[in-house]
Curated annotation (Swiss-Prot):
Family, as annotated: Belongs to the selenoprotein K family.
Topology in membrane: Single-pass membrane protein
Region feature (Disordered): 48-94
Biological-process GO terms, alphabetical: calcium ion transport; endoplasmic reticulum calcium ion homeostasis; protein palmitoylation
Alphabetical keyword list: Calcium, Calcium transport, Cell membrane, Endoplasmic reticulum, Ion transport, Membrane, Selenocysteine, Transmembrane, Transmembrane helix, Transport
Superkingdom: Eukaryota
Subcellular location: Endoplasmic reticulum membrane; Cell membrane
Cross-referenced PANTHER family: SELENOPROTEIN K (PTHR16875:SF0)
Taxonomic classification: Eukaryota, Metazoa, Chordata, Craniata, Vertebrata
Gene that this sequence comes from: selenok
Protein name: Selenoprotein K
Length: 94
């Protein structure tokens, strides 16, 4: 963590960014990233726990979403205020 003491910016990190533990963690992180990248190219519907997302889509117990209901036709009217006037057609009878 970075902090300021006596007008100087100090860093409290005790380990070097090039230490052996950092390099091994970075290496294994890169290996896992590359492995998961190619695994999702081959099997794109793979979820985090390794199951197919199609079969475990609702594995948390929620269930599928409800039926969407009827689709309403016409203009949106929420009952707030008067209806707008009819469109002007300029019908002067010519």
């Amino acid at each position: 963590m970075v902090y300021v003491s006596n007008g100087q910016v100090l860093d409290s990190r005790s380990r070097s960014p090039w230490s052996l533990s950092f390099l091994t963690d970075f290496f294994w992180g890169a290996v896992e990233f590359i492995g998961l990248f190619f695994q999702t190219l081959v099997q794109p519907d793979l979820s985090k726990d390794g199951n197919n997302s199609a079969s475990s889509r609702f594995s948390d117990g929620r269930g599928p979403p409800g039926f969407p209901g009827r689709r309403r036709m016409g203009r949106i009217n929420h009952g707030a205020g008067p209806t707008p006037p009819p469109m002007g057609g300029g019908g002067u009878g010519r």
